[in-house]
UniProtKB/Swiss-Prot annotation:
Gene Ontology molecular function, alphabetical: leucyl-tRNA--protein transferase activity
Entry protein name: Leucyl/phenylalanyl-tRNA--protein transferase
Subcellular location: Cytoplasm
Family: Belongs to the L/F-transferase family.
Function per UniProt: Functions in the N-end rule pathway of protein degradation where it conjugates Leu, Phe and, less efficiently, Met from aminoacyl-tRNAs to the N-termini of proteins containing an N-terminal arginine or lysine.
Entry keyword Magnesium: no
Catalytic activity entry: N-terminal L-lysyl-[protein] + L-leucyl-tRNA(Leu) = N-terminal L-leucyl-L-lysyl-[protein] + tRNA(Leu) + H(+); N-terminal L-arginyl-[protein] + L-leucyl-tRNA(Leu) = N-terminal L-leucyl-L-arginyl-[protein] + tRNA(Leu) + H(+); L-phenylalanyl-tRNA(Phe) + an N-terminal L-alpha-aminoacyl-[protein] = an N-terminal L-phenylalanyl-L-alpha-aminoacyl-[protein] + tRNA(Phe)
Taxonomic source organism: Nitrosomonas europaea (strain ATCC 19718 / CIP 103999 / KCTC 2705 / NBRC 14298)
InterPro entries: Acyl_CoA_acyltransferase (IPR016181), Leu/Phe-tRNA_Trfase (IPR004616), Leu/Phe-tRNA_Trfase_C (IPR042203), Leu/Phe-tRNA_Trfase_N (IPR042221)
Enzyme Commission number(s) of this protein: 2.3.2.6
GO biological process entries: protein catabolic process
Gene3D superfamilies noted in UniProt: Leucyl/phenylalanyl-tRNA-protein transferase, C-terminal domain (3.40.630.70), Leucyl/phenylalanyl-tRNA-protein transferase, N-terminal domain (3.30.70.3550)
Lineage: Bacteria, Pseudomonadati, Pseudomonadota, Betaproteobacteria, Nitrosomonadales
Signal peptide: none
Length: 236
């Protein structure tokens, strides 16, 4: 059994999460900024289908990318050195979420629905949720969004409309977070795409311990502006 959350119900200990399905911890509650921030501080995130009860997750193991461990392939390195794209931050947050929500060939549906978009847009307006965007010829070509608390970034989703556009955004995010002293990017669950860029699984207990340390550090709680430029590129 998992705990049912009401408006004032705290999250249960992470150790109470189910083994199958992996990480299911609680159901119910709401997507208020207070609830979401409390969840992310503890390494918990919402994931549920539209029209269904809110489900809260904390899988074990946890997929993370430590910024210093980022891997860049030769082909991506060549792409990153070009001057045919521009990186922007927090200039099209809701548009990025909507693009991430668009149907994909390998998915029957999407968990990024209007309720989620409204909730994370509220976090964005508070300076807690952020988007990193790759623009090509004035068009949004790819990007990602997530939540930043303390010195941890919790990646939620990414999309590409052009080759490597989401990877370009991730590289710039990782390098900028490293410059700011952030300790990790939470990737939630294992994917081959993220593993190819250096992400790896760690035990939930290790993730939770590191998260507690990063929560105590001051972060960039404002609209983001990146000062990182990939080596070999000119300023845009």
């Amino acid at each position: 059994m998992i705990r049912t959350l009401y408006s004032d119900t705290p999250f249960p200990p992470l150790e109470q999460a189910l083994i199958e399905p992996n990480g299911l911890l609680a159901a119910g509650g709401d997507l208020s900024p207070e609830r979401l921030i409390s969840a992310y501080r503890q390494g918990i995130f919402p994931w549920f289908n539209p029209g269904e009860i809110i489900l809260w997750w904390s899988p074990d193991p946890r997929m993370v990318l430590f910024p210093r461990e980022l891997k860049i392939s030769r082909s991506l390195h060549k792409t990153l050195k070009k001057n045919d794209y521009q990186i922007r931050t927090d200039s099209a947050f809701t548009e990025v979420m909507q693009a991430c929500a668009a149907p994909r060939e390998d998915q029957a549906g999407t968990w990024i629905h209007e309720e989620m978009i409204a909730a994370y847009t509220a976090l964005h307006q508070m300076g807690v949720a952020h988007s990193v965007e790759t623009w090509i010829e004035g068009e949004l070509a790819g990007g990602l969004y997530g939540v930043a608390i303390g010195r941890a970034f919790f990646g939620e989703s990414m999309f590409s409309r052009a080759t490597d556009a989401s990877k370009i955004a991730l590289v710039h995010l990782a390098r900028q977070l490293e410059n700011w002293g952030y300790g990790l990017i939470d990737c939630q669950m294992k994917t081959a795409h993220l593993m190819s860029m250096g992400a790896r699984e760690i035990p939930r207990s290790q993730f939770s311990k590191r998260l507690n340390q990063l929560n105590a550090l001051p972060g960039q709680n404002r609209k983001w502006y990146f000062d990182f430029t990939y080596p070999g590129r000119s300023e845009q």
